[in-house]
Amino acid sequence: MAVPKSKITRSKRGMRRAHDALVAANPNECPNCGELKRPHHVCPSCGYYNEREVIAQDEVDLDEDAA
């Protein structure tokens, strides 16, 4: 079984963990509808990506759904 040869110092441990931090999300504003969206992803509210409609969004009439 593998056993460490010597103790890992606090400095070496910290240097190894320097790249482990989580990065907060960086949302961008959709140029079509103005909602926040993830960069390089289709806008979930309007379905546009790169100023083109990629996913057709169905128009919902609230008056018909209530009846």
UniProtKB/Swiss-Prot annotation:
GO biological process: translation
Coiled coil: none
GO molecular-function terms, A-Z: structural constituent of ribosome
Claim: Ribosomal protein is one of the keywords in the record: yes
Keywords associated with the record: Ribonucleoprotein, Ribosomal protein
GO cellular component, one term: large ribosomal subunit
Signal sequence, renumbered to the chain: none
Family: Belongs to the bacterial ribosomal protein bL32 family.
Protein name: Large ribosomal subunit protein bL32
Organism for this UniProt entry: Jannaschia sp. (strain CCS1)
